From Swiss-Prot:
Protein name per the record: Long neurotoxin MS4
Keyword Metal-binding: no
GO cellular component, as recorded: extracellular region
Record-annotated disulphide pairs: C3-C24, C6-C11, C17-C41, C45-C57, C58-C63
Biological process (GO), any one: modulation of receptor activity in another organism
Database matches in Gene3D superfamilies: CD59 (2.10.60.10)
Membership in a protein family: Belongs to the three-finger toxin family. Ancestral subfamily.
InterPro entries: Snake_3FTx, Snake_toxin-like_sf, Toxin_cobra-type
Subcellular location as annotated: Secreted
GO molecular function: acetylcholine receptor inhibitor activity; ion channel regulator activity; toxin activity
Length: 64
C-alpha cells in the first residue's frame, strides 16, 4: 500500500507503508494560519477530534 504524505491539498509525494500500517489517513483542521492537512500510513483509523474538519481513512493506493 502507498499513501500520500504531504500537508497540501495537491499532493504528489507517496510512501510505501510499513508492515502493520495498512490504512491511508488524511485529517484536516483549522488553525490561525489557515487549514492544516496531515497525511500518512496508520495501523488504525483515529477518531475525529473536536477541532478536526474532516477525517478520511481508506485502503487503496494513494487514496488519501
Amino acid at each position: 500500500l502507498t499513501c500520500k504524505t504531504c500537508p497540501f491539498n495537491t499532493c504528489a509525494n507517496s510512501e510505501t507503508c510499513p508492515a502493520g500500517k495498512n490504512i491511508c489517513y488524511q485529517k484536516k483542521w483549522e488553525e490561525h494560519r489557515g487549514e492544516r492537512i496531515e497525511r500518512r500510513c496508520v495501523a488504525n483509523c483515529p477518531k475525529l477530534g473536536s477541532n478536526d474538519k474532516s477525517l478520511l481513512c481508506c485502503r487503496r493506493d494513494d487514496c488519501n
